[in-house]
């Protein structure tokens, strides 16, 4: 069990404890007063809706040795035990991350920590990095949207990026399991809320930046400024930190000049002759098929033929960013190009639904599940599928409730532009009226004759598969790997992949 003197943690924030507290042993840290037990230091984290500091008295009653809260929480509570409930003025979330990291003995310093941020592509890239590193014989931990896992342990993730108390504890567990590398999906929320405070990154990837989370960030500039923080101290190491940037993205290209020579730029659009930079990685001779893409991948020193078993140019970009960062970490390009050929992909990312009877499946439409839930994500997926589709392209999608409303008509317009028919339905409506979300999407659509809408997602998927014929492709977008639907305060079982597979199986029996 981890144990540390309380005064060592308080020294980080300049708090001098009372004589009664100075030698107290702390064996746990928590942001949750209900998880507190004897030996715990409770940190009252301010939240979007509730200030966790208000629960400090409950935490002490539950056995916490001490609690640290902000001055705002103190004003609301009034009288407190000043010896055991300690108050700091500001920057709580950053300070709390440092305290937790110190408690767990700075685990990121014992790992080669790679962060992946961006609007789209994070999960595919982190899965690919984990896959390649494990194939290269490296013990690797993965933290992200789908799973948190390391040698001997795996759990379903509750957040894309955990809060600092959980994250640092899990990083320490990965160290204890002798992990050498850790791959971390880094959301914009986690940067803004300092969940990654205390993490020191060996390397970082910026995938792309397109409209999302504008219900949280005031505008795209604010969204960008939040993301860019990952690429500078105290997060990315100052001198030796490696950054890989998608040069084809206009927002990200702004960042390269700030990073000077420490960044590697990656492009699927332009070639070396158009760009002079010793850290430039690019592709030529691109070809795209139903099974993936091939290209010649160029580094500043060598080139190699590459097959990426993922559909679409956006996935080619994902792949070469992953390969570039491992190449910069001194792995062999030849080994990487060989190993990527067998990468199975990430769940719910351009995932083709298979049924048992292969002979019958040839007479059925292709059904693809993808997590695309932003305008740019949906556009790139549809553009990639459109190039390969021999028949009709049929799209099923919705937009999440209690989230950025401005993207709804944009996604409606994109679905209409690239699809032959669109089924608009529900996608985690949460507390919003599902029909109102559909109406918002319809605001972006001109030709209503191409549109069918049904707020019942099962019915929409069922009708889309019935509607589709051989050589058609049905894209079911928005939920990807998710196995639930959020309706008001209820969470019900709902898995696009299982439902689509069952409906395809039923359709096959009628053939």
From Swiss-Prot:
A biological process term (GO) from this entry: cell wall organization
GO molecular function, one term: ATP binding
List of residues that carry N6-carboxylysine: 227
Gene3D superfamilies reported for this sequence: Mur ligase, C-terminal domain, Mur-like, catalytic domain, MurE/MurF, N-terminal domain
PTMs per UniProt: Carboxylation is probably crucial for Mg(2+) binding and, consequently, for the gamma-phosphate positioning of ATP.
EC number: 6.3.2.13
Name of one Pfam family that matches: Mur_ligase
SUPFAM superfamilies xref list: MurD-like peptide ligases, catalytic domain, MurD-like peptide ligases, peptide-binding domain, MurE/MurF N-terminal domain
Chain residues that bind UDP-N-acetyl-alpha-D-muramoyl-L-alanyl-D-glutamate: 33, 160-161, 187, 193, 195
PANTHER family listed in its UniProt record: MUR LIGASE FAMILY MEMBER, UDP-N-ACETYLMURAMOYL-L-ALANYL-D-GLUTAMATE--2,6-DIAMINOPIMELATE LIGASE MURE HOMOLOG, CHLOROPLASTIC
Function noted in UniProt: Catalyzes the addition of meso-diaminopimelic acid to the nucleotide precursor UDP-N-acetylmuramoyl-L-alanyl-D-glutamate (UMAG) in the biosynthesis of bacterial cell-wall peptidoglycan.
Name by which UniProt lists this protein: UDP-N-acetylmuramoyl-L-alanyl-D-glutamate--2,6-diaminopimelate ligase
Gene designation per UniProt: murE
């Amino acid at each position: 069990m981890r144990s540390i003197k309380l005064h060592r943690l308080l020294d980080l924030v300049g708090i001098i404890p009372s004589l009664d507290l100075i030698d107290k042993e702390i064996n746990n840290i928590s942001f949750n007063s209900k998880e507190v037990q004897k030996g715990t230091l409770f940190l009252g984290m301010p939240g979007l809706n509730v200030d966790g500091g208000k629960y400090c008295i409950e935490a002490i009653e539950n056995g916490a040795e001490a609690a640290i809260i902000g001055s705002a929480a103190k004003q609301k509570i009034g009288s407190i035990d000043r010896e055991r409930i300690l108050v700091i003025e500001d920057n709580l979330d950053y300070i709390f991350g440092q305290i937790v990291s110190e408690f767990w003995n700075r685990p990121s310093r014992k790992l080669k920590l790679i962060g992946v941020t961006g609007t789209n592509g994070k999960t595919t890239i982190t899965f690919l990095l984990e896959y390649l590193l494990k194939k290269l014989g490296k013990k690797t931990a993965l933290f992200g949207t789908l799973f948190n896992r390391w040698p001997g342990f795996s759990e379903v993730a509750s957040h894309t990026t955990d809060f600092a108390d959980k994250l640092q504890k899990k990083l320490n567990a990965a160290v204890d399991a002798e992990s050498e590398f850790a791959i971390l999906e880094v959301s914009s929320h986690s940067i803004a809320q300092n969940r990654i405070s205390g993490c020191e990154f060996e390397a970082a990837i910026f995938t792309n930046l397109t409209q999302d989370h504008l219900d949280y960030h005031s505008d795209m500039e604010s969204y960008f400024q939040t993301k860019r923080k990952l690429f500078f101290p105290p997060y990315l190491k100052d001198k030796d930190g490696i950054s890989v940037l998608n040069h084809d993205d206009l927002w990200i290209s702004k960042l390269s000049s700030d990073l000077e020579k420490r960044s590697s730029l990656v492009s699927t659009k332009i070639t070396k002759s158009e760009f002079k930079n010793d850290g430039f990685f690019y592709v030529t001779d691109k070809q795209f098929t139903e099974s993936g893409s091939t290209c010649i991948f160029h580094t500043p020193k060598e080139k190699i033929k590459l097959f990426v078993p993922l559909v679409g140019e956006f996935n080619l970009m994902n792949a070469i960013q992953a390969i570039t960062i491992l190449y910069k970490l001194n792995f062999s390009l030849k080994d990487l190009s060989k190993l990527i050929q067998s990468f199975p992909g990430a769940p719910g990312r351009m995932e083709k639904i298979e049924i048992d009877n292969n002979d019958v499946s040839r007479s059925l439409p292709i059904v693809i599940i993808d997590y695309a839930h932003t305008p740019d994500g949906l556009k790139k997926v549809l553009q990639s599928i459109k190039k390969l589709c021999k028949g009709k392209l049929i799209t099923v999608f919705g937009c999440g409730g209690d989230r950025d409303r401005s993207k709804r008509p944009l996604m409606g317009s994109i679905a209409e532009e690239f699809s032959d028919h669109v089924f608009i339905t529900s996608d985690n409506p949460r507390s919003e009226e599902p029909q109102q979300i559909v109406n918002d999407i319809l605001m972006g659509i001109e030709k209503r004759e191409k549109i069918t809408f049904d707020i019942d997602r099962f019915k929409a998927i069922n009708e889309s598969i019935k509607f589709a014929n051989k050589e058609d492709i049905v894209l079911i977008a928005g939920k990807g790997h998710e196995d639930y639907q959020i309706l008001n305060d209820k969470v019900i079982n709902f898995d696009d992949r299982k439902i689509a597979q069952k409906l395809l199986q039923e359709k096959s029996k009628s053939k």
